[in-house]
């Protein structure tokens, strides 16, 4: 399984086609060292296929996927531009990878409606892919998407399907550990703390065994998030500060650490972390986290309720577009409390009602269809 030729190669380009296929197998298996070596070989030969648009598109798709595996936090709005410069592929294999990877890109930069549509288009072509492991990879990434949009149960279900397939194949232990890590996140969202910790520990054991620091830090970040969601701020900060020292462009970890410092009353530390995170998000044009950082900055600076309201409402219009009702509920509830403390009861009442409506929508969205 997994060794088939994914696209029909033009005569004379069999060697490059095989190299590209092998490269994808290493990328998909998260074997970073092997993937890097193959990329160097491919890059030295790629100039010889300038006339073959299909192979060049395939290379551009895999190069995006490779960059994502190496450093998904550097993925920016323009990271898919090289792929988009090609005509829409008619070949089923290429069309599948185009839609699948476009879904990964859109989800990473916070364009969740585009991601949803792209994953749906890819799923229609999944039957054209005679490779069970590719189906597992697809389920894993769709599970990650469901987690990103606060659908914890759907995420748990999809990632468990992926894990089951990966676990049946030798050489895919890293993928199983990635599934364990993501199931841990889904359990965190579902407030199943013990189960979350169990899955994170399994993932950590595997990543320590292969001594891949990037993967170890990913789990440490998620443990930090798990402690943060239980309001165990000092413990969360301990994990997250290590991640942020070693991965200074990790805007997600910067955001959570800043929020925990704010909860602890460390406002100047939080302010510095917010400034760093905001700057990283400007660089990669991540709209979602720009809104999160702006709102957190207003909360941390103890803005008057009306100034906070302007910042929250800017974010809410984006969150509505992307159907991220969980965030609307969280931020409007904070805003309602701010108005209540200032004795502005009409505004407070309005936002308490509005956040309760957002809460209902979040629960509806969470339900398994």
Task: Explain the meaning of each model-derived region.
Residues 1-102, 274, 278, 304-314, ...:
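Flexible inter-repeat linkers and adjacent short helices
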Residues 11-15, 51-56, 90-97, 130-137, ...:
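Alpha-solenoid helical repeat architecture
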Residues 19-30, 60-71, 96-110, 137-150, ...:
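Tandem amphipathic alpha-helical repeat scaffolds
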Residues 32, 73, 112, 132, ...:
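TPR-repeat structural position
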Residues 40-47, 80-88, 120-131, 160-171, ...:
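Amphipathic alpha-helical segments of tetratricopeptide repeats
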Residues 54, 62-161, 165:
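Long, mid-chain structured domain cores
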Residues 156, 160-226:
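Loop-centered beta-sheet repeat module
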């Amino acid at each position: 399984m997994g060794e088939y030729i994914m696209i029909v190669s033009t005569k004379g380009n069999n060697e490059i086609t095989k190299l590209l296929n092998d490269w994808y197998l290493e990328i998909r298996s998260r074997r970073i060292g092997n993937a890097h070596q193959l990329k160097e070989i491919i890059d030295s030969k790629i100039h010889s296929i300038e006339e073959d648009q299909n192979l060049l598109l395939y290379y551009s798709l895999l190069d995006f996927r490779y960059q994502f595996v190496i450093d998904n936090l550097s993925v920016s709005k323009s990271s898919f531009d090289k792929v988009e410069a090609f005509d829409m592929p008619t070949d089923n294999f290429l069309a599948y990878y185009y839609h699948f990877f476009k879904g990964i890109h859109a989800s990473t930069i916070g364009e969740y409606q585009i991601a949803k549509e792209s994953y749906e288009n890819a799923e229609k072509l999944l039957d054209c892919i005679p490779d069970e492991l590719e189906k597992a990879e697809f389920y894993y990434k769709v599970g990650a998407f469901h987690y990103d949009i606060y659908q914890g149960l759907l995420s748990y279900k999809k990632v468990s399907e992926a894990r089951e397939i990966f676990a049946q194949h030798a050489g895919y232990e890293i993928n199983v550990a990635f599934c364990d890590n993501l199931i841990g996140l889904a359990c965190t969202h579902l407030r199943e703390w013990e189960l979350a910790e169990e899955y994170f520990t399994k993932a950590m054991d595997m990543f320590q065994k292969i001594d891949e620091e990037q993967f170890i830090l990913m789990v440490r970040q998620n443990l930090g998030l798990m402690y943060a969601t239980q309001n165990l701020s000092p413990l969360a900060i301990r994990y997250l500060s290590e991640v942020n020292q070693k991965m200074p462009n990790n805007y997600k970890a910067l955001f959570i650490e800043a929020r925990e410092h704010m909860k602890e009353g460390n406002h100047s530390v939080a302010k510095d972390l917010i400034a760093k995170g905001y700057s990283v998000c400007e660089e990669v044009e991540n709209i979602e986290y720009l809104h999160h950082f702006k709102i957190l900055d207003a909360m941390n600076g103890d803005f008057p309720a009306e100034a906070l309201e302007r910042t929250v409402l800017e974010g809410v219009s984006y969150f509505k577009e992307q159907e991220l009702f969980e965030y609307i509920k969280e931020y409007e509830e904070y805003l309602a409390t701010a108005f209540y403390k200032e004795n502005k009861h009409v505004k407070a009442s309005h936002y308490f009602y509005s956040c309760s409506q957002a809460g209902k929508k979040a629960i509806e969205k969470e339900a398994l269809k």
